[in-house]
Amino acid sequence: MITRIRGEMLEITPDYCVVMAGGLGYKIYIPDNCQEEIPDPGQEIDLHTYLSVREDAMTLYGFTSGEQLAVFELIMNVSGIGPKIALALVGTIPPTEFYLSVLNDQVNQLTKVPGIGKKSAQRIILELKEKVKDITSKDAYQDISASEKLDNTGEKLGISTRHKHLDELKAALSSLGYTNREIEKTVDAIQGQITEGQDMEELLRLALQKLNTK
């Protein structure tokens, strides 16, 4: 599997680019929103890639960030969705907006993508909601130390519930590819909106909405 290509940019078109790496020229299809990040011919480029293998063809798809690739691979797991539609979605909706659309059942947001109708959008939400929740929270919960968990009587050990949830939120945002600076600024900005009893999903929605308004 080819997961990363770094080399010299040879050619750029509205649909794909050609990268020379290791003496070979790779034709790589890219989403629309990557066009501005693609360097001019002759300059070096580093792309995260996905290799689609079919009986009649092998096709490379490239992305300027690991987060875009993660969303592309996630969408490819949806029944009836192929690489062309997955690429169109990544090129139309930024990863943060996509996660919000799935978590908040925003069918109309997904139907903005060429090739995705109402039924396809509903299927994407139905099949991916739990996976998106898992992606945005799994790493956070794995990182919680034993001293941050509750004992058998429900007493908190060594850290407040609020502090614990903020740590979990930071870890979840980090797993989505955001920088420490972006995470700290976002968490500081939403602290005034946090109320007692909010779960991780609600906190994550607040944070993603804040990041999406930048």
UniProtKB/Swiss-Prot annotation:
Gene Ontology biological-process entries: DNA recombination; DNA repair
InterPro entries linked to this entry: DNA_helicase_Holl-junc_RuvA_I, Hlx-hairpin-Hlx_DNA-bd_motif, NA-bd_OB-fold, RuvA, RuvA_2-like, RuvA_C, RuvA_C_sf
Keywords, in A-Z order: Cytoplasm, DNA damage, DNA recombination, DNA repair, DNA-binding
A GO molecular-function annotation: four-way junction DNA binding
Compartment list: Cytoplasm
Annotated spans, Domain I: 1-64
Residues forming coiled coils: none
GO CC terms in record: cytoplasm; Holliday junction helicase complex; Holliday junction resolvase complex
Domain III: annotated span: 161-214
Region span, Flexible linker: 144-160
Region (Domain II): 65-143
Subcellular location, principal: cytoplasm
Function: The RuvA-RuvB-RuvC complex processes Holliday junction (HJ) DNA during genetic recombination and DNA repair, while the RuvA-RuvB complex plays an important role in the rescue of blocked DNA replication forks via replication fork reversal (RFR). RuvA specifically binds to HJ cruciform DNA, conferring on it an open structure. The RuvB hexamer acts as an ATP-dependent pump, pulling dsDNA into and through the RuvAB complex. HJ branch migration allows RuvC to scan DNA until it finds its consensus sequence, where it cleaves and resolves the cruciform DNA.
HAMAP family linked to this entry: DNA_HJ_migration_RuvA
Family (UniProt): Belongs to the RuvA family.
Subunit structure: Homotetramer. Forms an RuvA(8)-RuvB(12)-Holliday junction (HJ) complex. HJ DNA is sandwiched between 2 RuvA tetramers; dsDNA enters through RuvA and exits via RuvB. An RuvB hexamer assembles on each DNA strand where it exits the tetramer. Each RuvB hexamer is contacted by two RuvA subunits (via domain III) on 2 adjacent RuvB subunits; this complex drives branch migration. In the full resolvosome a probable DNA-RuvA(4)-RuvB(12)-RuvC(2) complex forms which resolves the HJ.
Domain-level remarks: Has three domains with a flexible linker between the domains II and III and assumes an 'L' shape. Domain III is highly mobile and contacts RuvB.
Protein name according to UniProt: Holliday junction branch migration complex subunit RuvA
